Amino acid sequence: MQALNERDVSIDYAFMVTVEKFMRHGCKNVPDYMLSGSRGDFTGVGDIHFFYSADEVLYGALPDFEEACKRANVPYTVSARPKMVHCYCMLPIFKEAKEDFAKIVDILKK
């Protein structure tokens, strides 16, 4: 994650370092799966489709999500576009976002 910090215009790596503290809210017994989706048990989940900017800090979490999918034997696909911002495909106002938003719509229609 930290390696992507200089390329990410929307999420700073420093936030990722401190977010767990906020999520715990002073509690030491918060289950791991509540702190990060990649720490959860994906057993029984259908196909998962990850859409990332290849230049966002959170793209660095992809190996953790891939490992979680493999542990649960869950099929997954990954789409990663360079030079996009976090959640770009949810803002279908430019070409790349429109293309990937259309892919998401097609997936949801199935």
Regions found by a protein language model. Name each.
Residues M1-K110:
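Alpha/beta-hydrolase superfamily serine-hydrolase fold, recognizing
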